[in-house]
Amino acid sequence: FHILEVRAKETLTRAGEPGRWIDYSIDSLRADFLEVFAAIEKNSKGRYRIIYNLARQQPADYYVDFVVESADNRSVAMPLFFKDVMRDLIANARKYTAPGGTINVGVYETEAELRFVVQDTGRGIPPDEIQTVVHYGRRGSNVQQVRTMGGGYGLTKAFLVTKRFGGRFWIKSEPGIGTRITIIVPRPTGPRVG
């Protein structure tokens, strides 16, 4: 239930200040996402594991590489909504990648911008659908039969949040190879918020 408490607190905070950026220590951000990965694995009811050491990967395991860095090597500032975006895109990567696949996640903050990349070895998105897959409720035609608990809004939310903060959003994907989503958001000027 700890993860639900954290999400509820984040939601209430965002309601009052939707444009606010907040500083997260790199260690706490990593810990938060290790909890997210643990919850995803637990929800599988033993169908797969999420592992972080490639040498331990078995055929039913997802290998996850999750790296967070910043110019100061201590903290990363991001919009309050951005952790949700990260969670959604990571969940999509897992959902559309078969067990045995790889999910790479990178976060890097410079003085000028926040960069986020998630890349998987999943199904990919048909090339003629990349422009429209960010529309509300849309999924690629090659995943219509995949049973999901979501409504197809993760990419939409990621795209809209990125645009809301003046950022840039790219999808590079190839069916049968995987997908790479890159988001770059300019940092606001002024002091960092803790």
Spans of model-derived segments:
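Glycine-rich ATP-binding loops of the HATPase_c
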Residues: 166-172
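Short conserved segment of the HATPase_c
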Residues: 125-138
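Hydrophobic Leu site in an alpha-helix of the histidine kinase catalytic ATPase core
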Residues: 151-155
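Glycine-rich GHKL/ HATPase_c ATP-binding element in histidine kinases
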Residues: 177-181
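Short beta-strand/loop element within the Bergerat-fold HATPase_c
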Residues: 100-112
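Acidic ATP/Mg2+-coordinating residue in the GHKL
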Residues: 120
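Short helix-loop "hinge" at the ATP-lid/N-box region of the Bergerat-fold HATPase_c
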Residues: 93-94
